[in-house]
Amino acid sequence: MKQKFDIITSTCVPLPIENVDTDQIIPARFLKATTREEKFFGDNLFRDWRYNADGTVVEDFVLNDPTYSGCILVAGKNFGSGSSREHAAWAIAGYGFRVVISSFFADIHKNNELNNFVLPVQVSEDFLKELFDSIRQDPKTEVEVDLPRQTVTNKTTGRSEHFDINGYKKHCLMNGLDDIDFLVQNENKTKEWEHGTEVY
C-alpha cells in the first residue's frame, strides 16, 4: 500500500519544454533494469539533460538549479509522448514528484503515471502559462492540488481549474491502493458475485 493522496501544496519545478518524450525522461540505455528500483530511475530522470557526456553536471538545467524544488513538476504541452515505457513513470516517481501538471499528456504515459502513484493534472494552456509566469517571477510560488475536489490552484493568483481523473484511479490514489491491493480488498465481494452468478 502506498501513501494516500489527498491535498498536496508545494513549490514547483518548471520545465517549459513541449513534446518531452519518454526517451528524454529516461534514456533507453537505462531500460535493462526490469524491477522498479525507484532510486536508480530517479537518479537518471532527464539524464541527458542533467549531465554532460563526461558525467559533469549541466549547471543551468532546472533539476540542478537549487532555486527550484518541490514535489510538483510543471511541464510543457504533450508530456510523455514516444514509446510506452513504464520506466518513465518510475523515474518521475523515483525522483520524488507526486504531481505532474501539463496542458496535454500522452495517454499511455498518463496511465503509467497513475499506476505509479503520480497524479497527472491536465490544465488549459492559459492556466499553464500563468503557472510558468508565476514560478519564474517567484520560485517560491506554491500550487495546491486537491484530489478530492479535483482542483488545482495557483496560490499566488488564487486562480483555480478543475481537472478530470478516472473514478477508479481516483479511489486508488486516495486510498493508497494499486490494482492488486484493490482486488485483495474486494476479494469477498468478488466471491459473493461469483457465487451469485448462474452458469448457463
What function would you assign to each model-found segment?
Residues 1-200:
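Cytosolic catalytic domains that perform sulfur/thiol-centered chemistry
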